[in-house]
Amino acid sequence: MPNNLQHQEGSYSLRSSNDVSPADDWTQTNDPKEKKRIQNRVAQRTYRNRIRARLEELENKIRCHEKASKQDGNENEDRASEKAMAQDFLITDQALQSLTLPRRVSSAGLSQEPATPPDLLLPSFFHQQQVKIPSAADELNQPKPPSSPPAWAEGQLNVAPRAAQARSIAPTSTGMHQISPSYGPPVFLPTEDLSIDIISSRGLSSSWKTAADLTVQGTHPLPAFPSCSLANIESPSPASSQATDPMDMTFHTATEANTAILPGHRSSLDERLEYVLERAEQVGFDNFDSLVTAYYSETFHGSSRLASEQRLSRNRRLPRVIAEIFRAASHWSAWERGGMNQEVIKSAECLLISEGTAARNALEGSLSLLVDGGNGSGDASSVERLVQNEIPNLWALMTSLASGTHSPRQQDRSGTALAAIMLLYFSGSMPKEQLLRLLIICLPDPVSPQKNN
């Protein structure tokens, strides 16, 4: 039985690549998307085959039950005369109604394993639990309760009018009455001190026989019969009870398929990144770019771990990420890197303009005092320090640009960068004579070749 269970549990998992056709062998392709499509196609085909086989099995069971019910109907017609004899016997035995102690009934003739499905249900005082036979057709056919209460409570013996649908009771030569069910061996009860109340009930389908309630009374206590307990009723095997829920199979198939394609740390970079992109879309992000944007731009709770990671990443990891991306962009096509370069230039423009707007007034007043107060190298150093403190980003940019076009005759290009900044900021807002004196201070004298020699 455990081997069967293990086989059944694994029957809904993704089939091995050795069991599929060459067209469905996902190990022969390197494309992750194509591999996933092949695996999903194989899993769906396997699931449909399992459902189709299960439906055929259920249809066969229903046909067997219908055939058995038709045969049982023919047997009931033959036993109609025997039912009449049993009714006469029960009516003449009315004196037993006053007895309160049930008579012990021998279980020697009872079958230990009644066949399924039974057409006779014993009442609750005959055994402590209601006998219920689980089967695959229970969902389609549920028996209704008896149409009328028995005459047991009114002190009368009653035999239901549908005696043809109950079990046959016939006297035997040994003084015992035989109850002949349609399934299983006969059951013998003593002829003395016997009262039976048979109640017919209707089922929802012709595949089930009419149920009857059997009440036995006598002068001795009635023990619990092994054949009447739930433990001895034939029930579906564990394998059949766990096998056939289509929704359950769908869930296991989808889960196992997703688990089978879950990439690990040894998987290729393409598979891992594709998995991350899919998970980001599943949790509500439009794409991976929106996830990264939200991580760096949103404001999280100050004491959360996410906020701490965000602050560290902004200061340490994000600059390296931008540098690596810009370095890798040199290998992109012109169309791919065009948009990024434009955004970099726009961002630099916004940064430098906002920096210069805030420092313009302070620079103009300080530089006017320096120009009017004197000249010389000392004044140039003062102007350079002032510019570095007020507009550091523009100073770094202009110095880098000037150093990239340096002349072998002039090693220090800071004066050129400083003069360019003065022209950029104060051309048109400062008097021309004052601006020329400022440029003379900023630009150093060129070194002649004779002096170098």
From Swiss-Prot:
Signal peptide: none annotated. The keyword DNA-binding applies. Residues 33-50 are annotated as: Basic motif. It is found in: Nucleus. This is Transcription factor radR. PROSITE patterns: BZIP_BASIC (PS00036). GO terms for molecular function: DNA binding; DNA-binding transcription factor activity. Residues 51-58 are annotated as: Leucine-zipper. It comes from Floropilus chiversii. Residues 1-30, 170-181 have a biased composition (Polar residues). It comes from the Eukaryota. Belongs to the bZIP family. Its main location: nucleus. Disruption phenotype: Completely abolishes the production of radicicol. Residues 30-62 form the bZIP domain. Transcription factor that positively regulates the expression of the gene clusters that mediate the biosynthesis of pestheic acid, a diphenyl ether which is a biosynthetic precursor of the unique chloropupukeananes.
